[in-house]
Amino acid sequence: MILRKLPGKQALICRCVSKTFLSVLDSPCFMERHLRDDHDDGEPPALLTYGVHDVAVFYKLWMCKTMLEESDEAKVLKVDDRHLWNYPCIETQSYFHPISSGGLILTRCNSNSPFVFNPIRKEVMKIPAQGDENAWKQPLGFGYDPKGNTHKIISVWETQEHVLVAEIFSLGDTDTKWRSLDISSSASALPFGHVSFSSSTVTIGGYVYWTATISEGSQGACTCGCRSAETGYRLETKNWTKHMVLYRRHLSGFLTQLSSRGLSSNSSASLIFEGPWQWWIFLPRSV
């Protein structure tokens, strides 16, 4: 109870007191309660927003409140909270939008390396850049793998030889490199033609969903997850990173997560595409 009443920075200092304090402060339930009860300065503890200036879109991460001082040795960058607007804006046009999973936020500025922000502990992790020059042009999937008990980033793109390839990065691995994935079985289920994934992704219950445009404007909703789905193409793969489902639907608009609060592994969730004339709703379920 006392720890919950401490300001965020003072509470984090207590992590060094003992292993018991460390376990309590790092537990998801404590972080959730602290965020809910924290009303310091009347500001939200973690807020990601954007504003338009000329033709560019600028993202500001309010919870960082300072500039990042990066070093070659540091994998995790500590973020001070003394200044609100000193963090440089992230300028982007259309390639990538920030996405979140389990309280973590993944963002990237065009061809630069991605960053994962932890607003509760005020830490930033720089993700290594990928070797293929075409990889950064496609969005990243970001979600929690319950089997591996870690967050993973997945990247799927098409090479100049029109081959669909994928790489995975695990935040909990000691090896800080992207791993190549064999998605030949998943790629064979896709219609023939050029594949372009949108930057609109959401994560619900172990799935990462995003839209893909194939050849002459035909669109579908693709997902990578740890469970199979009731509709669409079902591919029998056991690994979270290798399961891909394609929904053959003509879509338009933006992929939006309605709500993920209180979802369990057996829950169904609604994904909605808001188009100019109608709404498309998908109900993925566990089977």
UniProtKB/Swiss-Prot annotation:
Residues 1-36 form the F-box domain. This is F-box protein At5g48550.
